[in-house]
């Protein structure tokens, strides 16, 4: 299993949102490039970077900063506001390893398919964020500001038929809460779509959570708030 540190960017700083709410922001004193270099030195193979300003505005705002983070030598999967072929190509040409496509996959499937065909499916990670208010996980869009009527399962089925292999799934209710991930959701995801390389995010607290997710068949975990805790040894998580 791949352990991927997450860095959320807002106005050039490292931040975390609580349950995706922009009015509940925790800002950290460490600078993004320093944070990326820190994880690279510890042996991380990949970073997950989200441009929150881009996610909110609909156009990536911090590509220059993300490219600077990439110069630390660590591969980056990045998203937040990629809403056109031009933006996708700009990010890809800048050397970003995998582009993270979120809301666009729900609001404009035709354009998303064009991007997938242009960039290639293996270079795309679909970020599908859900609210499980009923038994059916429904997708949220636009930086979690709006709900859609699309279910996770129907959207995954659609894009799997178009070659997508990597999907990052977050239960919004778990994100930033440090109460544990939604294991039932990920178990269903792997059972329904075993050919997808699932990335889990939201609520992961400790090594036991990571081990449990691995036993369910999850391919990668995204670690955010957990890595800002003083008692966490990231090198041990990589073992």
Swiss-Prot record:
Its main location: cytoplasm. The active site is at 8 (proton acceptor), 129 (proton donor). GO terms for biological process: L-histidine biosynthetic process; L-tryptophan biosynthetic process. Its EC number is 5.3.1.16. It is found in: Cytoplasm. Pathway: Amino-acid biosynthesis; L-histidine biosynthesis; L-histidine from 5-phospho-alpha-D-ribose 1-diphosphate: step 4/9. GO terms for molecular function: 1-(5-phosphoribosyl)-5-[(5-phosphoribosylamino)methylideneamino]imidazole-4-carboxamide isomerase activity. It catalyses: 1-(5-phospho-beta-D-ribosyl)-5-[(5-phospho-beta-D-ribosylamino)methylideneamino]imidazole-4-carboxamide = 5-[(5-phospho-1-deoxy-D-ribulos-1-ylimino)methylamino]-1-(5-phospho-beta-D-ribosyl)imidazole-4-carboxamide. CDD domains: HisA. Keywords: Amino-acid biosynthesis, Cytoplasm, Histidine biosynthesis, Isomerase. One of its GO terms (cellular component) is cytoplasm. InterPro entries: Aldolase_TIM, His_biosynth, Isoase_HisA-like, Isoase_HisA-like_bact, RibuloseP-bd_barrel. It is an enzyme of class 5 (isomerase). It comes from the Bacteria. Belongs to the HisA/HisF family. This is 1-(5-phosphoribosyl)-5-[(5-phosphoribosylamino)methylideneamino] imidazole-4-carboxamide isomerase. The lineage of its organism: Bacteria, Pseudomonadati, Pseudomonadota, Gammaproteobacteria, Legionellales.
């Amino acid at each position: 299993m791949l352990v991927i540190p997450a860095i959320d960017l807002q106005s050039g700083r490292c931040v975390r949102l609580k349950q995706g709410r922009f009015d509940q922001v925790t800002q950290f004193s460490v600078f993004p490039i320093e944070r990326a270099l820190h994880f690279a030195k510890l042996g991380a193979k990949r970073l997950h970077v989200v441009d929150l300003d881009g996610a909110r505005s609909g156009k990536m705002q911090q590509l220059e900063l993300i490219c600077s983070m990439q110069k630390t030598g660590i591969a980056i999967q990045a998203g937040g506001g990629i809403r056109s072929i031009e933006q996708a190509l700009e990010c890809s040409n800048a050397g970003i390893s995998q582009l993270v496509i979120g809301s666009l996959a729900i609001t404009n499937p035709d354009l998303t398919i064009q991007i997938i065909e242009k960039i290639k499916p293996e270079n795309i990670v679909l970020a599908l964020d859900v609210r499980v208010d009923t038994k059916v996980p429904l997708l949220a869009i636009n930086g979690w500001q709006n709900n859609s009527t699309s279910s996770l399962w129907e959207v995954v089925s659609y894009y799997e038929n178009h070659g997508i292999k990597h999907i990052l799934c977050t239960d919004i209710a778990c994100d930033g809460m440090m109460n544990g991930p939604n294991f039932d959701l990920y178990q269903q995801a792997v059972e329904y779509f075993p050919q997808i390389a699932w990335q889990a995010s939201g609520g992961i607290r400790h090594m036991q959570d990571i081990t449990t997710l691995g036993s369910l068949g999850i391919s990668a975990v995204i670690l955010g708030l957990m890595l800002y805790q003083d008692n966490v040894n990231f090198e041990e998580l990589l073992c």
